Amino acid sequence: MRYLTAGESHGPQLTAIIEGLPSQLPLGTSDINPWLRKRQGGYGRGRRMVIETDEAQILSGVRAGRTTGAPVTLVIANKDHRNWTEIMSPEPGGEPRKKALTAARPGHADLTGGIKYRHKDLRDVLERASARETAARVAVGAVALKLLSELGVEGANYVASLGGIETRAPFSWDQLDAIEASDLRTPDADAAAQMRERIDQAKKDGDTLGGILEVRFRGLPVGLGSYVHWDRKLDGRIAQACLSVQAMKGVEIGRAFENAVQPGSRVHDAVYYREGTYVRDTNSAGGLEAGMTNGEELIVRVAMKPIATLMKPLPTVNVVTHEAADAARERSDTTAVPAAGVILQCVIGWVLAEAMLEKFGGDTLPELQERVQAARAYAQAY
């Protein structure tokens, strides 16, 4: 499978094309739009989330509620585009340059992207570099999550920490309803209250906050990925996918950083054979060994830096005059940490769905289901 996204933050729409989905997968906008709503949620978001009420349209590849095997085209309209039609016009003219953005924002793509692509109007950089693009990736990921659910795989995400405040309650699959009900995507009510206070203070200060997200998947068959070649190792592919999301700066699988300071005897997960199957009583590895799923729960933690657009701008330079300036201010969030967990579950879900198809193949969902079931039976009897 593969996909491509296109579109700018304030352009008419975001577009995604997915190629390689098996046919006969039940799919409709009701499988995608709830994920888009989750992405827009969370305490600390800005006014853009009020303007946009994201809904996907399926333009190809699905008929009568099932994929056909043809490329699937998804479109998400940018409602705010009506306020930007002249500035974002693709036609030659003076209006776009009248409001040129020339004060590069530290921490953003502005300066480096301007140098790379030779833009002096930095809007030509930020419009595509914007995290608005993640709406398209969530739509794509929602399709992948639908495929995984048809193969018996379930995912979850929550906020492990925000602004230095940690979720102290250990994760449990029984807490999913509480996580979904929380505007901070944490089951820890005390931590959520402290996070809100921290966000409110940051907003008053014109500042932003980052955090750590945890994403989990259960029900994965043994052997997704490979140890044979570097580019087929699933942990590397998951890390790349996570770090490709705007503002994500670090990835941990299992208890990686804690494990780094422990002796091996306290790190590696002992294997036992009980009741006719292989079991581990611990999961320090986070469900991946030597680049392959081992049948345990996949656990991925991702560090998100604070959003780079500040309401109290940092010092920078005007790229036209080279004079000192305050960084440009764009409408932004105080934090998007809760939404980031949703995005990360979707992008990791894509990697896992891709790995499923690579290992098991099949032009149709029934073929794929049969092969996954056979692989699970083999691993059970091994």
UniProtKB/Swiss-Prot annotation:
S-S bonds: none
Cofactor(s) for this UniProt protein: FMNH2
Classification via PROSITE patterns: CHORISMATE_SYNTHASE_1 (PS00787), CHORISMATE_SYNTHASE_2 (PS00788)
Domain of life assignment: Bacteria
GO MF entry, a single one: FMN binding
Pathway field: Metabolic intermediate biosynthesis; chorismate biosynthesis; chorismate from D-erythrose 4-phosphate and phosphoenolpyruvate: step 7/7
The keyword Lyase is assigned to this record: yes
Cofactor: binding comment: Reduced FMN (FMNH(2)).
Residues bound to FMN: 128-130, 246-247, 290, 305-309, 331
CDD domains associated with the record: Chorismate_synthase
Catalytic activity: 5-O-(1-carboxyvinyl)-3-phosphoshikimate = chorismate + phosphate
Keywords of this entry: Amino-acid biosynthesis, Aromatic amino acid biosynthesis, FAD, Flavoprotein, FMN, Lyase, NADP
GO cellular component, one term: cytosol
InterPro entries in the cross-refs: Chorismate_synth (IPR000453), Chorismate_synth_AroC_sf (IPR035904), Chorismate_synthase_CS (IPR020541)
EC number: 4.2.3.5
Annotated binding of NADP(+), by residue: 39, 45
PANTHER family according to UniProt: CHORISMATE SYNTHASE (PTHR21085:SF0)
Function: This reaction introduces a second double bond into the aromatic ring system.
Family: Belongs to the chorismate synthase family.
Subunit structure comment from the entry: Homotetramer.
Name this polypeptide is given: Chorismate synthase
Native source organism of the sequence: Deinococcus geothermalis (strain DSM 11300 / CIP 105573 / AG-3a)
